[in-house]
Amino acid sequence: MPTFLLVNDDGYFSPGINALREALKSLGRVVVVAPDRNLSGVGHSLTFTEPLKMRKIDTDFYTVIDGTPADCVHLGYRVILEEKKPDLVLSGINEGPNLGEDITYSGTVSGAMEGRILGIPSIAFSAFGRENIMFEEIAKVCVDIVKKVLNEGIPEDTYLNVNIPNLRYEEIKGIKVTRQGKRAYKERVFKYIDPYGKPFYWIAAEEFGWHAEEGTDYWAVLNGYVSVTPLHLDLTNYKVMKSIKYLEDSP
């Protein structure tokens, strides 16, 4: 019976992680270790300067106080599972998409990345929608993908970023293996004044959007397909290595 380590960045109370937890129980043991709050946008931060505490919510269900998604992967693997590798690290289901360059901010994607760094095949799941998300329907798709990965595996140094349209299971057209797209929006910094006359700021996007080039993650979900983008840990831009060889020249 397979074992799954399930994390997220929306917090242990998120309907996304709870829907996926329930859906995965038919496949094997599901160990949930999730933050105690919403940490969307926290990226791949790991806590080195403060102690971490865990609180047990239920059987195989824990929350990490002040912990990031990457922290949750570490504590789940090293403490709860006692360094017995799970079959998969799964991160999500995120309440909203993780497409294009936004994956660099994503705690959801970073949870999967941390699993891969620890040598465990890993998948990040996100819902393409922001309101009235049908998590139970989306969880069915997640289970389908998990079954396929358990049978076929994921190449070393690779983890998967999966975005799923907010549709009923039978309405989804299929699965597309995609490349990372590019976003078509910018953040703004909004300034406000608190009751004491002090300024405070809020970083937010004016309007979400991505370039819908065929073959990209955004194109797939926009057209009713599940997007599966293979990501890897090696961030080297091999294409430009020769073009910057001039930097090796002596001054």
UniProtKB/Swiss-Prot annotation:
Q: What is its main location?
A: cytoplasm
Residues at which a divalent metal cation binds:
9-10, 40, 94
Q: Where is the signal peptide?
A: none
Record's catalysed reaction(s): a ribonucleoside 5'-phosphate + H2O = a ribonucleoside + phosphate
The answer, when asked if Lyase is one of the entry's keywords, is no
State how the cofactor is bound. Binds 1 divalent metal cation per subunit.
Q: Which GO terms describe its cellular component?
A: cytoplasm
Which family would the database say this protein is a member of?
A: Belongs to the SurE nucleotidase family.
Name-wise, this protein is 5'-nucleotidase SurE
Native organism:
Aquifex aeolicus (strain VF5)
